[in-house]
């Protein structure tokens, strides 16, 4: 599988409401696992944008030949995202104690989430 970094933009009514990247989580022996990062515009929260981007990223990862997808750092206090990723088939496979410096809460845990494609 050739290494590549893909980026996508979600639009609604001509307005950018989100974006995500997709690439191999690692080179070499781990290159069959995809990694994504998503951003949803604050004004678009609750409109299904993140769910649509996740669904698109899973389909795109499969089309590129990835066999799994991993999120390396999901902030433990982002309960909405955790529920969504779990609903989309991801499982929490690890906890990183104090791995995220939250601007309001200080150091909080982060999760590694994973699913086989």
Predicted features along the sequence, with ranges:
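Terminal substrate-recognition subdomain of acyl/acetyltransferases
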Residues: 96, 102-117
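Conserved beta-strand-loop-alpha-helix junction that forms the acyl-donor binding cleft
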Residues: 71-81, 99-103
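Conserved acetyl-CoA-binding loop of GNAT-fold acetyltransferases
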Residues: 86-96
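Conserved GNAT acetyl-CoA-binding A-motif
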Residues: 61-74
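Acetyl-CoA-dependent GNAT
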Residues: 1-43, 54-55, 116-117
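Conserved acetyl-CoA-binding loop-helix of GNAT-fold acetyltransferases
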Residues: 38-40, 46-63, 79-87
């Amino acid at each position: 599988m050739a290494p590549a970094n893909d980026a996508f933009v979600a639009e609604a009514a001509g307005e950018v409401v989100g974006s995500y990247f997709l690439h191999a989580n690692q080179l070499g022996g781990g290159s069959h696992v995809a990694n994504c990062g998503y951003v949803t515009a604050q004004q678009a929260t609750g409109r299904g944008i993140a769910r649509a981007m996740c669904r698109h990223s899973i389909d795109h990862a499969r089309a590129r030949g990835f066999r799994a997808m991993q999120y390396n750092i999901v902030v433990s206090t982002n309960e909405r995202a955790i529920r969504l990723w779990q609903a989309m088939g991801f499982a929490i496979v690890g906890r990183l104690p104090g791995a995220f410096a939250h601007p309001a809460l200080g150091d909080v845990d982060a999760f590694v989430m994973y699913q086989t494609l």
